[in-house]
UniProtKB/Swiss-Prot annotation:
Taxonomic source organism: Drosophila melanogaster
Annotated Gene Ontology cellular component terms: endosome; Golgi apparatus
Name this polypeptide is given: Protein MON2 homolog
Database matches in Pfam families: DCB (PF16213), Mon2_C (PF16206), Sec7-like_HDS (PF09324), Sec7-like_HUS (PF12783)
Gene Ontology molecular functions: cytoskeletal regulatory protein binding
Gene: mon2
Family that this chain belongs to: Belongs to the MON2 family.
UniProt keyword Transcription regulation present: no
Biological process (GO), any one: actin cytoskeleton organization
Keyword list, A-Z: Protein transport, Transport
Function: May be required for traffic between late Golgi and early endosomes.
Coiled-coil annotated residue ranges, if any: none
Length: 1684
């Protein structure tokens, strides 16, 4: 092999490898330079070889490997450990790189051999050998043999590490040699050719000609056999030592892993047969001859044979197991010998470990069904061969029986010299077997089909450890189970999980004889082994496994029609289900002959069984099975009297056996044949003992025992298993459906026989067993597909049972018949029962025959059956309806309520489910019958359910309309007549019949019936009314619905108001505790229902005529209900009205398009009616007059009175009323007049003033928060906005309503500050509120939050004004004045407002309307003369409110924001008023100037103000006022002419009649100077009085502001024209100078800075300006007036 092929490396890797080799050789050269010059020279030569190689370095290394190996071999001969290690490492590297050829491999092997002989680096040597053989295949033949011998030699060294390493290496290399055989395709054929040319290698050396991998493997295996046989090897020359155990292990490994080699090669096969088998038989000799006998009493022991050696025997058995498992097809005779030997190893005289090993081998073999099949085919089926299968199972049975008897004998000390290791069982949860007190626990458990050896795996043990006494029976028990499983696998041809390639093939022809032989060879031996195991097992799991095996085996026998083995196993299981004496009694008269069974099933275990039975009643210390159930014996003719008297005690094992029988019969009922009787007899006894009684469908359930049966009981644990047993019983009879007809008749005959026996006992007044009747029922149920086969015999016997005088027998006879009839009718037969009259008649015949039975209970059960038939199979009763209805109709009231209830249930099912299969003519009768049940008064639930049935009928009519319409009834007399409608179709008459009957039930005396009937009536009309012809609708409205409304109204008004008697357990809610309240509910239901129908079919009714009359009538009904004193009725009426008003459909539009004029006229008429009805409802319901208020107050004073005397409409009612208006308004807006609007506003105002009752709080609170509008308020404002929107449209018909809209909104806006009172609705619109109803604590009403409502009204008003300010009606009606007056209230209250948002909204609204309105006022002053005083007063009261606000109340940020709002007002005056003063009244301008003066100096505005808390922060406001004053009084405007005109106007309009052109301006300056003087004087006085204590900060800020203002004023006066400032003003300014000087003593830096600015401005005033030397007398007058 070349390097390239082996390494697969690239050129670069090769180059690196060569360099590494050169480096290693250089290192080796240096190491051997002195001591080993010849190695040094060889290294240098190797280096030169590597250096001088050609360009193909890969081939160079391979071709020069032998030269470069030379120094390495020499190095290994030096015995220098360091050099040897280095050389071995280089060798391993060369081997790894696969550059070593055969010659090189020989060199390496020789070198390693030398190291081995010198005991140097043994581990490294083994590693190198492993590498040499595993990395390539160049080593074979003698070189391979030498390498293997080398490893064998090291395996027997003294160092344990080397021994273990060498052992592992040998195992690996031996496997490697055989693995190579698979790689060589022609190895087998070459060996076969060699065989044909000459005899196989027997002599020394073996075959030397063929150097193949197969020959290597052959020679190796041959020598291993030689070495194990203590002979000299032929090929492995140089072997000095070889243990037999190691050789056997190697042989086992080869035979286990490479069986294909032996199967495919004749040489290997011959070697196996002639050498290996002979070796095994030879080595087995000590095991066969040795016997373990007890020591004789005289002490003279015979000379023992050679004693078997455990390690050899164990390995031999492992080898035998492999030979049998893998090579049985080529070693047939040898395997027979091996199996016979293994079976003999189970003899009692063999050592315990030898028996244990044999058991483990047998277990390995029996888990493979293919092996069992091969054994039977090769041995048991042959005439002169050993019956291996039979002998194996018989040996197991003998071994198990011996184990049990021996354990008991050892426990009782009957065997001398044997140590007693068995003790009585101490725990209760043990697994195993117990015989006569000797306990054999299960020490080994196995998964099914899996063997797990213990002693066969003790490869490291010299001797077997102590084997537990119960180990053998544990393995033997598993062997029997797996043997049964394997036999089943053979018979059923179940594939193995892990099949081998050499498994014997069983053909179809061979299979049947093989299976029969298997059963014949195994059944008696298996049964004789199973019986003692069942009898002695003490745990459920073990017993379960054994019983499963017995079930499976019995089933297999049945499959093969082997009756004797089948019956033997079934009988054994049945006997095990009872205590022994009871079993003997009940099976004494069994017709089945069990003589043969006795010879097979009890021969080996009869004594054992009797011993075991006796042991149960032996000494007190013995094991006693736990009794789990005690019951009375089933009365039977076969039971002796003694047995009848004693209770039957069942153990858990008995119940397990019962389950096993059930399982067997369930899964394999077809093979029972004549055994059915014994099986059913067994089950009947067990069912009786356990107390299982039949229940529905024939299944059995546990029933409580009578208290008198003190000696009878079932443990709790078993009670939980009883349902499982019952289910298994049911499943057993369910499986009868898979039996053929003959087998089924066998089963029914057996059940009938048992039933006759029970009937005979019942005639003797003894409690009968109902098992047979129940199971006849179950059998019939599961065999419905072939019901004709068994119906006659089955039902005839059951009818006979129904006539029995014993009530239990009779009950179950009826139960069985009725259940069978129901099931048969429900079953889906091949020919559908609906079409099979013969079968239907046959099935209903037994039910009809029951009518001849006189017993009342039978009649009840018959009716129940009819009910259930309807419930389950009514749709197929195509031929049976007359009979069914006849049975239902035969029941009348004298039969009693139960039968009436049952009859109604039948009717209910007929109507609900089976109308489709009934004749057409039955439908009116069904309606009448249902209505009759609805009106009956015996049972309310029946009445309600009957009404539900009428809905079902309507649903049926709808779904089958086509079919019903197409069917014409000949006898029309069964349909009622409806006058007034010509030629009403039969289908419509059917509907009208239904509606009329429901309408009658709607006025029943019982509220529940009325409610149900009403709901059904309207649901039916809503769902199916579209099916009626249009003329029929008129009949429905005028003959059903309107009469219904009238009847309900009349009955409601006449209903009693006394409380209903709530006797009994029925709780009646307070809202329904009188007849009147109950009728109110009916009124709500009927009115809403009729309105909904009317609304839905409005277009149809309009086309039929009389619509206006119908419209008026239904609105009258609504009005009557809406004005009801019952809140529920009134609210429902409004909802109905709302539904009608909001109705608008495409049909209406289409009708208007077809005939627009007629449609319009009709619409106007009906909507005028609707408006009048709405107005009437609104006026009447919201009329909270003084008398009503007085009643409410009277109720407060007389607390005991009820609120029944008067009625306060709820918020929901008012909200609904208001929300209806938009729908009406869109139709009447063209005719909407001012009078209509006034009435509408009256309704709105009254609705707002209605007090809110406490029970309405959840309604309000669930929809709004404190900051949102209530639904009522929201609806009112929506209506106002709707009218406003229409009024503001161009060319609107109602534009004249705009002023009225303003006034109504302003009325609402006042509620933000003054909530309404009771009387407000009848007082003047602007009357002041005299109080609030919330103040009356005893009134059960709550205060409403009107603030959002009032504020929203203000906002709407402002928006409306902004869009309509210039309208003539708005100007002429002085709406702006009204708005100002309305806003004056919140603005004057300011901080006293309920919410700060109110006055903030008011001032922002005022600013908004003034921005808009002042322009209009200037344009049309004649309409605004009355505005100005109120406006000035409003501004003054807002800017200087009487209410007090502190930082503690509102916080600093809020006060700053408030001051900003005040400044906005001043800015409005500055921008919108003062620039246009010439266009406004003089008095108003004077009031504005006074207001600005008042605000400019805050400390001088009011001497009584608390500086600490209120006005200390209004500096910005004061500054704004001051700057506005200055701008107005002194500074030049950009338009001089405007100012002159303004001043002239002021003078002209002056009240005193004497003033100059700048009168207002000078007045402002004089007032300012006077206020400055007051502030300065007060500051100086306070500072002197305060001493060293500084004044408060706000005082310092105030004086600082005044000083800055003085400085600003001086500058402004200097710049102002002379005409604007007179001499007294200058004198007054100079007069301030002394006060300024007094301020110089202040310690405040802020004041000092401001003071300095003011004093600096006085520089130019030290001498009065000449321009002011002359002052007029008029100025003096003005000055004096200003100072005053």
């Amino acid at each position: 092999m070349s390097f390239v092929g082996g390494g697969g490396c690239g050129g670069q890797d090769v180059h690196k490898f060569v360099e590494a080799l050169q480096a290693d050789f250089k290192t080796l050269s240096l190491e051997t330079k002195k001591k080993y010059p010849q190695i040094k020279e060889a290294c240098e030569e190797a280096i030169s070889k590597l250096c001088t190689a050609g360009s193909s370095q890969q081939n160079s290394v391979y071709y020069t490997v032998n030269q470069i190996l030379y120094p390495l071999v020499q190095g290994c001969e030096t015995k220098d450990l360091k050099i040897i290690k280095f050389c071995l490492g280089m060798m391993q590297r060369l081997i790894t790189q696969q550059v070593v050829d055969q010659k090189g491999a020989l060199y390496i092997t020789n070198a390693l051999w030398t190291l081995m002989e010198n005991n140097i680096e043994e581990v490294k040597v083994l590693q190198t050998v492993t590498l040499l053989l595993t990395t390539n295949t160049v080593v074979h033949g003698d070189t391979l043999a030498k390498a293997l011998v080398l490893c064998f030699r090291l395996h027997y060294a003294k160092n344990p590490t080397i021994v273990n390493t060498a052992g592992a290496t040998i195992r690996q290399l031996v496997s490697l040699v055989f693995e190579r055989v698979y790689l060589e395709k022609d190895s087998v054929s070459s060996l076969q050719q060699q065989q044909s040319s000459g005899s196989p290698a027997e002599g020394e050396g073996g075959n030397q000609d063929v150097q193949t991998f197969a020959s290597d493997a052959f020679l190796l295996f041959q020598d291993l056999v030689q070495l194990v046989n203590a002979d000299q090897p032929y090929w492995l020359l140089g072997m000095t030592e070889m243990t037999r155990t190691f050789g056997l292990e190697l042989l086992e490994a080869v035979l286990t892993n490479f069986s294909a080699v032996f199967h495919e090669s004749n040489d290997f096969r011959l070697l196996l047969k002639e050498r290996v088998c002979a070796l095994v038989i030879k080595l087995f000799s000590p095991n066969v001859k040795h016997r373990q006998l007890p020591a004789p009493s005289n002490g003279n022991a015979p000379v023992p044979a050679e004693k078997p050696y455990f390690p050899i025997s164990m390995r031999l058995l492992r080898l035998v197991a492999i030979l049998i498992q893998k090579y049985h097809t080529i070693l047939v005779t040898e395997c027979e010998i091996f199996l016979s030997l293994i079976i003999k190893f189970l003899d009692p005289d063999k050592p315990a470990w030898q028996r244990a090993l044999a058991l483990e081998v047998i277990h390995k073999l029996v888990t493979r069904s293919s092996l069992i099949a091969f054994f039977c085919k090769s041995y048991d089926l042959k005439n002169h061969a050993t019956n291996i299968v039979h002998d194996m199972i018989a040996a197991m049975g003998s071994y198990i029986r011996y184990s049990l008897i021996n354990a008991s004998a050892m426990l009782n000390g009957q065997q001398n010299g044997v140590a007693n290791s068995l003790t009585a069982m101490s725990g209760s949860n043990q697994c195993g077997f117990m015989f006569r007190g000797a306990y054999l626990p299960l020490v080994a458990t196995y998964a099914p089909g899996v063997s797990k050896a213990v002693y066969l795996e003790m490869l490291d043990k010299i001797d077997a450890s102590n084997i537990p006494d119960s180990y053998g029976i544990s393995v033997g028990h598993a062997i029997l189970l797996d043997m049964t499983r394997s036999i089943g696998g053979v018979i059923q041809r179940t594939p193995e999980l892990h099949p081998s390639h050499n498994t014997a093939v069983i053909t179809e022809e061979e299979h049947k004889p093989l299976c029969l032989q298997l059963v014949n060879s195994s059944w008696s031996a298996l049964l004789s082994a199973f019986i003692p195991l069942v009898e002695t097992s003490i745990d459920e799991a073990t017993t379960e496994n054994i019983l499963k095996a017995m079930q499976n085996y019995a089933a297999l026998c049945g499959m093969l029609e082997q009756l004797q083995p089948r019956d033997a196993f079934i009988m054994a299981m049945c006997r095990a289900s009872f205590p022994p004496h009871y079993a003997m009694s009940i099976f004494a008269n069994t017709t089945q002959s069990d003589g043969d069974l006795r010879c097979h099933t009890r021969s080996g275990s009869q004594d054992l069984s009797s011993q075991f039975i006796n042991s149960c009643s032996g000494d007190a210390g013995d094991f006693r099975p736990q009794i789990v159930a005690v019951g009375t014996p089933l009365p039977s003719a076969s039971l002796p009297h003694s047995v009848m008297q004693a209770p039957v005690m069942l153990t858990n094992k008995n119940l397990q056996c019962m389950r096993a029988i059930l399982f067997l019969a369930h899964n394999n009922g077809g093979i029972l044949g004549t055994s059915w009787h014994i099986v059913l007899q067994t089950l009947q006894h067990l069912v009786w003992i356990l107390g299982l009684k039949p229940s529905t469908g024939g299944s059995l359930q546990a029933m409580p025992k009578p208290a008198v049966e003190a000696n009878v009981g079932i443990q709790t644990a078993v009670m939980a298993d009883l349902p499982v047993l019952s289910q298994m019983l049911s499943q057993l009879f369910e499986s009868s459906q898979y039996l053929d007809d003959v087998a089924l008749h066998h089963l029914i005959d057996a059940l009938c026989k048992l039933s006759h026996e029970a009937m005979e006992l019942a005639y003797a007044n003894r409690e009968p067993s109902l098992f047979a009747v129940a199971k006849l029922l179950e059998t019939g149920l599961v065999n419905m597909p072939r019901i004709k086969v068994l119906w006659r015999p089955l039902t005839n016997h059951l009818l006979e049972v129904c006539q029995h005088r014993h009530i239990r027998m009779r009950e179950w006879g009826v139960e069985a018949i009725t259940y069978l009839v129901k099931s048969a009718l429900q079953f889906k037969h091949k020919t559908p029962l609906k079409e099979n009259m013969e079968l239907q008649t046959m099935l209903l015949s037994p039910l009809s025959e029951l009518s001849t039975v006189l017993h009342a209970d039978v009649r009840q059960r018959q009716l129940d059956c009819v009910l259930q038939i309807l419930n389950t199979a009514g749709e197929i009763l195509s031929f049976g309806w007359p009979a069914i209805i006849e049975i239902i109709g035969a029941v009348n009231e004298h039969h009693g309520e139960p039968l009436i209830r049952t009859a109604f249930q039948c009717l209910q099912l007929v109507i609900t489910d089976f109308l489709t299969v009934m004749p057409w003519r039955c439908l009116p009768l069904c309606i009448s019958t249902a209505a009759k049940f609805g009106s009956q008064t015996q049972e309310l639930n029946i009445s309600l359910t009957a009404i539900g049935l009428m809905w079902n009928i309507s649903d049926f009519f709808n779904q089958n309309q086509d079919k019903l319409m197409s069917t014409q009834l000949q006898d029309v007399s069964i349909l009622p007549d409806f006058p007034g409608t010509v030629k009403m179709p039969q289908f419509d008459k059917l509907w009208m019949c239904l509606y009329a009957k429901l309408g009658e039930l709607c006025v029943d005396l019982r509220p529940a019936v009325r409610k149900s009937a009403g709901q059904t009536l309207f649901s039916t009309i809503s769902a199916h009314g579209s099916l009626l012809n249009p003329p029929t609708w008129q009949a429905l409205v005028w003959q059903v619905l309107f009469p219904l409304l009238d009847n309900v109204r009349a009955l409601s008004s006449s209903a009693s108001n006394e409380k209903v008697d709530a006797s009994g357990n029925i709780l009646i809610h307070h809202s329904r505790n009188t007849a009147q309240k109950q009728w109110a509910e009916t009124q709500v239901l009927t009115l809403s229902g009729v309105c909904r129908v009317f609304n839905t079919k409005r277009e149809l009714l309009q086309m039929l005529g009389d619509f206006e009359r119908a419209w008026s009538l239904i609105l009258e009904f609504i009005q009557n209900a809406a004005l009801s004193k019952n809140g529920e009725v009134s609210l429902a009426a409004l909802k109905s009205l709302q539904e009608i008003m909001y109705h608008n459909t495409a049909e209406r539009t289409e009708r208007a398009l077809k005939d627009p004029q007629t449609a319009q006229e009709q619409d106007e008429e009906i909507w005028t009616i609707a408006w009048n009805i709405w107005l009437s409802i609104g006026m009447e319901s919201t009329k909270m007059s003084t008398s009503t208020s007085a009643k409410l107050q009277q109720q407060n004073s007389n607390g005991a009175e009820t609120q029944e005397d008067f009625y306060i409409p709820s918020q929901a009612f008012l909200t609904a009323l208001i929300q209806i208006f938009p729908a009406i308004f869109q139709h009447i807006q063209v005719k909407f007049t001012a009078a209509d609007f006034d009435k509408f506003c009256t309704v709105l105002t009254n609705a707002v003033c209605i007090p809110v009752q406490t029970d309405a709080v959840p309604y309000i609170m669930s929809t709004v928060s404190d900051t949102l509008l209530t639904p009522l308020h929201d609806g009112i404002l929506d209506c106002m906005e709707l009218i406003q929107k229409e009024a503001t449209k161009p060319d609107s018909h109602i534009s004249q309503l705009i002023p009225a809209i303003f006034r109504q909104l302003l009325i609402f806006s006042k509620f933000a500050c003054a909530p309404p009172t009771f009387q407000q609705s009848v007082e003047h619109k602007y009357a002041k509120s005299s109080g609030h109803y919330a103040n009356n604590a005893s009134v059960e009403v709550v205060s409403m939050n009107y603030i959002p409502f009032g504020e929203k009204s203000i906002s709407i008003c402002v928006k409306l004004y902004q869009t309509t300010a210039t309208e003539d009606s708005v100007v002429q009606e002085q709406i702006l004045h009204d708005i100002v007056k309305a806003l004056r209230t919140p603005l004057a209250m300011k901080y006293k407002c309920l919410s700060s948002s109110t006055w903030k909204l008011a001032i922002s609204s005022l600013i908004s309307v003034l921005h808009t309105g002042l322009k209009v006022a200037r344009a049309k002053p004649q309409h605004f003369a009355s505005l100005w005083d109120d406006l000035a007063d409003t501004l003054d009261k807002f800017l200087f409110p009487a209410s007090v606000c502190t930082i503690e109340d509102r916080g600093l940020e809020e006060i700053v924001l408030d001051e900003t709002i005040d400044c906005q007002v001043i800015e409005l005056l500055r921008d919108e008023v003062l620039p246009h003063s010439h266009e406004m009244p003089h008095q108003f301008i004077m009031q504005i100037v006074v207001l600005l003066n008042k605000g400019s100096i805050h400390s001088a505005s009011d001497t009584n103000i608390c500086y600490e808390s209120d006005w200390k922060l209004r500096e910005i406001f004061a500054k704004t006022c001051f700057e506005t004053l200055l701008q107005f009084s002194l500074l030049e405007d950009h338009a001089n002419t405007n100012n002159n005109r303004l001043n002239a106007n002021v003078l002209t309009a002056g009240a005193a009649g004497a003033g100059g052109k700048d009168f207002a301006g000078r007045l402002a300056v004089t007032a300012l100077l006077h206020r400055f003087q007051e502030v300065l004087k007060r500051f100086n006085d306070d500072e002197r009085q305060s001493g060293k204590c500084p004044l408060p900060r706000f005082r310092l800020s105030e004086i600082s502001f005044v000083l800055k203002a003085i400085a600003t004023l001086v500058v402004s006066m200097k710049k102002a024209p002379a005409s604007k400032v007179n001499k007294p003003a200058w004198d007054q300014l100079i007069g301030l100078y002394p006060y300024l000087v007094d301020c110089t003593t202040t310690t405040s830096p802020e004041v000092s800075r401001s003071l300095r600015e003011a004093l600096l401005q006085y520089t130019d005033l030290l001498q009065a300006p000449r321009s002011c030397s002359a002052a007029t007398s008029n100025d003096n007058v003005i000055q004096s007036n200003g100072q005053e």
